[in-house]
Amino acid sequence: MHVTLVEINVHEDKVDEFIEVFRQNHLGSVQEEGNLRFDVLQDPEVNSRFYIYEAYKDEDAVAFHKTTPHYKTSVAKLESLMTGPRKKRLFNGLMP
């Protein structure tokens, strides 16, 4: 299992817009055949910080995800909402 934890920091006045943009990515991602989990989390202490927990069955599923319209649209719209680049950490999922 391929797991990615992504940290996304957005401008404080763009929080609602981020949530709507990412909702579309979430709804599309959970429909992908190789997707096992796609959680969107908001930091309770920093309202403009989000974490995305993505689990895919393998690298091929991740590669497919990055070709989807919902992913490409989301990434394009995120650039103007973020305070800096996304931070990604990769994990091997052992016990889901």
From Swiss-Prot:
Molecular function terms in GO for this entry? (4S)-4-hydroxy-5-phosphonooxypentane-2,3-dione isomerase activity; oxidoreductase activity
- Fetch the InterPro entries from UniProt: ABM_dom, AI-2_Isomerase_LsrG, Dimeric_a/b-barrel, LsrG
The answer to whether the entry has keyword Isomerase is yes
Is Transcription regulation found in the keyword set?
no
Kindly report, in one word, the top-level EC class recorded for this enzyme: isomerase
Q: Where is the ABM domain?
A: 2-91
Q: Which PROSITE patterns match?
A: ABM (PS51725)
Q: Where in the cell is it found?
A: Cytoplasm
GO CC terms, sorted: cytosol
Which reaction(s) are listed as its catalytic activity?
Answer: (2S)-2-hydroxy-3,4-dioxopentyl phosphate = 3-hydroxy-2,4-dioxopentyl phosphate
Primary place of residence? Answer: cytoplasm
Keyword annotations of the record = Cytoplasm, Isomerase
Question: Superkingdom, according to UniProt?
Answer: Bacteria
**A Pfam short name:** ABM
**EC number, as in UniProt:** 5.3.1.32
Q: Which HAMAP family match?
A: LsrG (MF_02051)
Q: Quaternary state and partners of this protein?
A: Homodimer.
> In which family does this protein belong, per the annotation?
Belongs to the LsrG family.
Say what the protein does: Involved in the degradation of phospho-AI-2, thereby terminating induction of the lsr operon and closing the AI-2 signaling cycle. Catalyzes the conversion of (4S)-4-hydroxy-5-phosphonooxypentane-2,3-dione (P-DPD) to 3-hydroxy-5-phosphonooxypentane-2,4-dione (P-HPD).
NCBIfam families tied to this protein: PRK10486.1
This chain belongs to the protein called: (4S)-4-hydroxy-5-phosphonooxypentane-2,3-dione isomerase
Species name for this entry? Escherichia coli O9:H4 (strain HS)
Lineage here is:
Bacteria, Pseudomonadati, Pseudomonadota, Gammaproteobacteria, Enterobacterales
